[in-house]
Amino acid sequence: MAMSSGGSGSGVPEQEDAVLFRRGTGQSDDSDIWDDTALIKAYDKAVASFKHALKNGDICETSGKSKTTPKRKPAKKNKSQKKNTAASLQQWKVGDKCSAIWSEDGCIYPATIASIDFKRETCVVVYTGYGNREEQNLSDLLSPICEVANNIEQNAQENENESQVSTDESENSRSPGNKSDNIKPKSAPWNSFLPPPPPMPGPRLGPGKPGLKFNGPPPPPPPPPPHLLSCWLPPFPSGPPIIPPPPPICPDSLDDADALGSMLISWYMSGYHTGYYMGFRQNQKEGRCSHSLN
């Protein structure tokens, strides 16, 4: 009996120690699993030390700069600079050719001075060949460049040709029998120094984005072909007429307008083929009814 009591007495404290140790560690794990107080304190300490270092550095830099700032030279040089700028402003006259920076894209285009306000040191320029009027500072005007003007005029002409080609292709897509093999849109060889010129008001090609554009609503899908009154179509027709593919889009100028144009062209072609198929099926039904009556 003594041995059994001694054994049970010696075993109880071991079990109690084990249980107490497990409960303690379990509670501490559950309570500290989402506790990030130490991390927040470390972050705040690092930010505070960084701000303190920056503040001390700024004070040192400002004090160093104040000691080493050079003295200004006499105002004679400033007067000479003012004379040079005044002379450069006075050289422009109404009707002079120049090159100006268009505010829409920040590129240089040839222009002509329409009016000058010497008090405000501004002028109104008209971009050559396009009619866009814009107010510019006289100090911002550049000397005219003949080669740039020629390239801009040539690009504008090719730009108009591309817009004409796009309208021709949209008309050809409405007539099933026309072929578009002979229509080849020209790729505008833009100068690497300049983007396309600014556009005229209205639906035209935008500056800096060469290629075909799709402005306005899509063309309405054509109606299905009329019923052949007394003609019986063969049971296996040759298929729908050839539709010209949508105009190519330059991969360098892909944007929302290009994606929208491609979607509208696909929608238009899908509507045409759907109408053709529905008309063909209706012709087949009418032909079968006429044969059954006969």
Swiss-Prot record:
Residues modified to Phosphoserine: S4, S5, S8, S28, S31, S187
Pro residues bias locations: 194-204
Q: Could you tell me which residues belong to the region Disordered?
A: 1-32, 60-88, 156-222
Query: Which superkingdom?
Result: Eukaryota
Using the UniProt annotation, give all residue ranges assigned to the region (Required for interaction with SYNCRIP).
279-294
The alphabetized UniProt keywords are: Acetylation, Cell projection, Cytoplasm, Isopeptide bond, mRNA processing, mRNA splicing, Neurogenesis, Nucleus, Phosphoprotein, RNA-binding, Ubl conjugation
Q: Which GO terms describe its molecular function?
A: RNA binding
Domain notes, please? The Tudor domain mediates association with dimethylarginines, which are common in snRNP proteins.
Name of the protein in question: Survival motor neuron protein
Q: What is the lineage of its organism?
A: Eukaryota, Metazoa, Chordata, Craniata, Vertebrata
